[in-house]
A protein has these predicted regions:
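Intrinsically disordered, low-complexity segments enriched in serine/threonine/proline/glycine
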Residues: 18-19
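Short, positively charged and aromatic/hydrophobic N-terminal segments
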Residues: 15, 24-27
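Conserved catalytic or regulatory cores that recognize and/or transform ribose-phosphate-containing ligands
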Residues: 31-195
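Hydrophobic alpha-helical elements and their junctions with loops/disorder across both membrane
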Residues: 10, 27, 150-152
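Short, positively charged low-complexity motifs
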Residues: 1, 9-14
């Protein structure tokens, strides 16, 4: 309607009633106010992205750095990436075990509390399968995310395509680099399309 009034003024040289001008200005102000409210809500309610998987490289930091350049409001979470802390937390907090099974069992139990909560709160779950190790925990967390109907983005090299075909099929995107993951997240959250 605003465009129609402006079209009449400029094309036909017609006059416009002062109430129509007031109406146009009020609509513009309302549209701007709605946009400001949406932007403020977007900034106050960042998306939660859980970064799961391989802990032997800086892929998490690479994703965070790229997304920082996009200025995308995101709150990141991740499992405990300190390998020894993750392995030994149960024995440190609940008492040591002589049997390695029970040592691992205690640690896994404590880690599951953190994992479950963070995945439940996530809007997007990114799972990285690295080159060197068989990441059973990463596959497990991908399964949890899928069961909870979370948006799942996988990050792995082509050499794992066949082994991960079932997990790939259940994901929303399969990426080959941290930069690709960041670009996908930026597009999904803000509609930013950069190559």
């Amino acid at each position: 309607q605003i465009a129609r009034y402006l079209f009449q003024i400029f094309v036909f040289g017609g006059s416009i009633h002062p109430l129509a001008i007031f109406s146009i200005l009020l609509k513009i102000q309302t549209m701007n106010a709605k946009k400001d409210i949406q932007q403020q809500a977007f900034q106050e309610n960042p998306w939660n992205v859980y970064l799961s998987g391989e802990i032997h490289s800086d892929w998490r930091e690479q994703i965070k750095e790229v997304l920082n350049t996009y200025q995308v409001p995101i709150q990141f979470s991740e499992p405990n990436t300190g390998h020894s802390d993750s392995d030994d937390c149960g024995s440190i907090l609940l008492g040591s075990e002589s049997d390695s099974f029970w040592h691992d069992h205690k640690g896994a139990g404590l880690n599951s509390i953190r994992r479950r909560k963070l995945i439940q709160e996530a809007d997007i779950v990114v799972v990285r399968f690295g080159k060197k190790y068989k990441q059973w925990n990463a596959a497990f967390e991908a399964g949890i995310a899928h069961a909870l109907n979370k948006s799942l983005i996988l990050l792995h090299d082509e050499e794992h395509d066949h082994a991960l075909k079932e997990i790939d099929q259940s994901s929303a995107a399969v990426c080959r680099s941290p930069e690709q993951v960041a670009a996908v997240i930026a597009y999904c959250i803000k509609g930013i399309l950069k190559n």
